[in-house]
Amino acid sequence: MSSVLPTPVLPTPGRNINRGHFPDDFIFGAGTSSYQIEGAAREGGRGPSIWDTFTHTHPELIQDGSNGDTAINSYNLYKEDIKIVKLMGLDAYRFSISWPRILPGGSINAGINQEGIKYYNNLIDELLANDIVPYVTLFHWDVPQALQDQYDGFLSDKIVDDFRDFAELCFWEFGDRVKNWITINEPQSYSDFFGVAYDTPPKAHALKASRLLVPTTVARPSKPVRVFASTADPGTTTADQVYKVGHNLLLAHAAAIQVYRDKFQNTQEGTFGMALVTQWMKPLNENNPADVEAASRAFDFKFGWFMQPLITGEYPKSMRQLLGPRLREFTPDQKKLLIGSYDYVGVNYYTATYVSSAQPPHDKKKAVFHTDGNFYTTDSKDGVLIGPLAGPAWLNIVPEGIYHVLHDIKENYEDPVIYITENGVYEVNDTAKTLSEARVDTTRLHYLQDHLSKVLEARHQGVRVQGYLVWSLMDNWELRAGYTSRFGLIHVDYYNNFARYPKDSAIWFRNAFHKRLRIHVNKARPQEDDGAFDTPRKRLRKY
């Protein structure tokens, strides 16, 4: 972890930041994911995913008991959503392809859903027709339920071949127009919170994932239900399963890159990365070497777990030392596929945490993932929060954290090209607010201004960050938080046909970062379509 940071070369503009402060080729955009926005769970030949099964089997584990059956109906409203992206003047739109929408049975042998292929072709063509660059994620956690039933999903090595085939199908169908691919979104999050069975006993602890706004206590089902993984081996701890899932995610990533480079690279000329989530791991006591080392270990277990194998073909040294044989080794052939299997690194950053040292558990049989790194995390020091909370849980607002994370990646992971693939903040869904009140999101506006200023500062100091994608374009179905948490630049009226309205942050982002503002720092805001976008009482779809 970096301790001494360089002095800024250029002053940063603070909250007056706009597109003119960045180079012309810097990418600005916003992102979504399939299960969180599409809906149409039973339309167009789509098969069920593990999320469909999980939300219908255990609605009590979703904060409001909801599911993504309709999400925000983007499957039927995608043209309207693309119109929003165009009105905002964004360069790029990140979305994910629903694996079970194009392969309902999970595998090629089970059949290709041509209606699903058609949907994504239409989406991509509509983006390009509006001069918007697609950034496409292959896996955003929606494993086909068929593969979960057949062999326990990412707990099985068998999924590597099925993911490779799914990826190859996407390259064949969409790669002539898609040049920016993200293989896997947040493999650490998936491994930790989603890749392991709910019905394994230690999972009751893992379900209390702060990132996902789950309740502090959960109820267990009366009967085991295979949703995320298997209980076939009750002697295997949840932590060991976590690392097995992570291992297979890495192998699936490498297999997808291999098939692209072997069959498509010469003609399609696309680029690849994984989107890796991390926090700024700040030592609780920066004068305590044990806390400094603990913060470094925490970064290894969060980010290095999936980044280091792409550089050296091995897991971070701290993980290998602490986990020993519990952490699988890569074969020589697997190492060859992993090393260099990226063109850029996607970074998802939301928040920061204090880290202090901890003693290892006495009973290794009771070890879980959150104790393996021998560190504690907390959001406060001496009763003072590391940053103000955005809402009731997990997201402390710490803009300087993104600056430190970018420097840590530059210094410790061979100075890669970086895209911020997610950065954003939520507000609680307050149903008592009027539409006009709900569109006032000053916290988000300041969050984006302050984080972009820190990204620019890191660029000034040589970090090769080349793009910034807000999470998210629109309010969506936010996983374990359901509809209780709003991340969008665009307000979605969940109770009125999912009508879309711009929040203050969307209007600011458009005025500051519209693609027509590439040349001059102080150029006036674009005037075209202002009334259509800024009018608060009109639905965007009317325009």
UniProtKB/Swiss-Prot annotation:
GO molecular function annotations of the record: beta-glucosidase activity
Gene: GLU3
Family: Belongs to the glycosyl hydrolase 1 family.
Active-site positions on this chain: 186, 422
Organism, scientific name: Carapichea ipecacuanha
Pathway where it operates: Alkaloid biosynthesis
EC numbers for this chain: 3.2.1.-
Listed Pfam families: Glyco_hydro_1 (PF00232)
Superkingdom in the source lineage: Eukaryota
Key words, A-Z: Alkaloid metabolism, Cytoplasm, Glycosidase, Hydrolase
Enzyme class: hydrolase
Name the record gives this protein: Ipecac alkaloid beta-glucosidase 3
